[in-house]
């Protein structure tokens, strides 16, 4: 059985100070993740505010992370757009910088049909020849990769995984029927459903909350793999996730990454920070979670 990673991959935030990338904060954050058992780092995805990053900024962030990680865990670059040729060029550059894999979101706004999805993803995979994680997030794109399409794409030698942010277990089961899970990984894109996702055979999660609790979130996966019932272990994490759901990702998680010292609490427009009262409640929820660990 060979997968890109198993367990927790972290959808990395982008730290800003005065609207500029804070490279030192980025390095501090990545070191924290590596020291706390993150199994992969996903760069320039939704949580990174990729729509408001310039090409130069994306490349600088990716290069910084790749150099720091130094092959200890896979670094996966978000390079997908709704333009196939632009996605190819971004993916080729990510490969040149040393990325271990790329993550490709479904085309949004202009969208396409299922045949178009196959051609889009295969064209990028053929051009780049680097492992590809498909990213299905219909809540953001209004477009889904149907299970039949996943089946077709899973036959491609470089298309090796799906980030499944549908939060739909019927979808998961339909996909599972059609793929070889020994060679094609299924990663949840929803932190709050990981208990059942793991129970149903998922290989891991591409996580937001793991930006601040990577060790605890990986321990949950490890416990499940050991045959333990993880419902009770998940409960305090679930409480923190409920607090995190106060607004759209990555607005709340950056209230916590900044609390831990990974840059200021800044986002780029059109995203705005939480109201002060919500920020306080969320940070108190994090403190309560950490205090519970020490009891």
From Swiss-Prot:
- Keywords, sorted A to Z: Amino-acid biosynthesis, Cytoplasm, Diaminopimelate biosynthesis, Lyase, Lysine biosynthesis, Schiff base
List, alphabetically, the GO terms of the cellular component aspect. cytosol
Q: Give the stretches traversing the membrane.
A: none
Listed under GO biological process in this entry are: diaminopimelate biosynthetic process; lysine biosynthetic process via diaminopimelate
Q: What class of enzyme is it?
A: lyase
Recorded GO terms, molecular function? 4-hydroxy-tetrahydrodipicolinate synthase activity
- The EC number(s) given in the record are 4.3.3.7
Q: Does the keyword field hold Amino-acid biosynthesis?
A: yes
**Catalytically driven reaction(s):** L-aspartate 4-semialdehyde + pyruvate = (2S,4S)-4-hydroxy-2,3,4,5-tetrahydrodipicolinate + H2O + H(+)
Pathway where this protein functions:
Amino-acid biosynthesis; L-lysine biosynthesis via DAP pathway; (S)-tetrahydrodipicolinate from L-aspartate: step 3/4
Q: Which residues form the active site?
A: 135, 163
Where, subcellularly, is it found?
Cytoplasm
Q: Where is this site: Part of a proton relay during catalysis?
A: 46, 109
Q: Which domain of life is it from?
A: Bacteria
**Protein residues bound to pyruvate:** 47, 206
Instruction: State the InterPro entries in the record.
Output: Aldolase_TIM, DapA, DapA-like, Schiff_base-form_aldolases_AS
The record's family statement is: Belongs to the DapA family.
Oligomeric state and partners?
Answer: Homodimer.
Q: What is its biological role? A: Catalyzes the condensation of (S)-aspartate-beta-semialdehyde [(S)-ASA] and pyruvate to 4-hydroxy-tetrahydrodipicolinate (HTPA).
> Which HAMAP family does the UniProt record give?
DapA
What is the protein's name according to its record? 4-hydroxy-tetrahydrodipicolinate synthase
What species was this sequence derived from?
Staphylococcus aureus (strain MSSA476)
Primary gene name? dapA
